Amino acid sequence: MANTLEQLKLYTTIVADTGDIEAIKRYQPEDATTNPSLILKAAQIPEYESLIDNAIDWAKSQSDDLAQQLDDASDKLAVNIGVEILKLVPGRISTEVDARLSFDKEQSIAKAHKLVRLYKEAGVDKSRILIKLASTWEGICAAKELEKEGINCNLTLLFSFAQARACAEAGAYLISPFVGRILDWYKKDTGKDYDAVNDPGVVSVTEIYNYYKQHGFNTVVMGASFRNIGEIIELAGCDRLTIGPSLLEELANSQVDITPKLVAATSTVAAEAPLTEAQFRWDFNQDPMAVDKLAEGIRNFAIDQGKLEVMLTAKLAN
């Protein structure tokens, strides 16, 4: 009998949620995703020292201004790690726009253009990149413009149906609803435990998946941020699932029978008129979990970006 991971791959595209090249070699995912926290973690792996040195040297060659060097080194490091990962996966790498730009559409677009340019200079076509943006109104609007340019986007930190609907209406290539972080909020709020079937994160992704398929949206649903393999098993059949190394290992060592739980609708109905900004903000604001977790997610990514910059600043000073 095939292990649980191999069975899951029959129904769902598996993505590695890591910057760790050894983990990617081990589990052979289709794609990989990174974020500021994962880049920070990867930057502390000894094997990546040369990638950091390259980013520092390149940044110094671009400008004499320390702030600009820091910005350049950070972007170049994320791209260097992405380029290494793309040597191992047949699909795409997701690279994230600085979380501090989450409420600035124009700066998010500019950062996306820069990342795409850096990948191109490294020999990587934009068809192998997903630009990650927070699912704020501004991030969604940035994605809408980038998609028109042929730059595909991964809308992340997604916790609500309002965000998911707006992303699809904007023509985003892919969304990353955060299953485990939704569960975290409800466990803390209610003091209850949830089995996988009733897990609020699983329920949310199932609702989004069904809505997309019923209304003919092409936006890919990629469940993210898992707390246990039960959540993953309940989302078998989802377009994609991005999974961290520890849970990939648990799936590989498990022998649970997998059946698809999410099945695309065979017929579609017309979608409603797109949400206006006012409607989006109101609907999103009505979901206290989503409001809390989006704000927290942006703050935490910004904190880890800051930690990475402290490390890079020390190296730039040498």
UniProtKB/Swiss-Prot annotation:
Coiled-coil zones: none
Metabolic or biological pathway: Carbohydrate degradation; pentose phosphate pathway; D-glyceraldehyde 3-phosphate and beta-D-fructose 6-phosphate from D-ribose 5-phosphate and D-xylulose 5-phosphate (non-oxidative stage): step 2/3
GO BP, sorted A to Z: carbohydrate metabolic process; pentose-phosphate shunt
GO MF, any single term: transaldolase activity
Main location: cytoplasm
EC number(s) stated in the UniProt entry for this protein: 2.2.1.2
Subcellular location: Cytoplasm
Disulfide bridge positions per record: none
A Gene Ontology term for the protein's cellular component: cytosol
Transmembrane domains' residue ranges: none
First-tier enzyme category under EC: transferase
One Pfam family in the UniProt entry: TAL_FSA
Catalytic activity: D-sedoheptulose 7-phosphate + D-glyceraldehyde 3-phosphate = D-erythrose 4-phosphate + beta-D-fructose 6-phosphate
Keywords of the record: Cytoplasm, Pentose shunt, Schiff base, Transferase
Family: Belongs to the transaldolase family. Type 1 subfamily.
Subunit record text: Homodimer.
Purpose of the protein: Transaldolase is important for the balance of metabolites in the pentose-phosphate pathway.
HAMAP family: Transaldolase_1
Protein name in the entry: Transaldolase
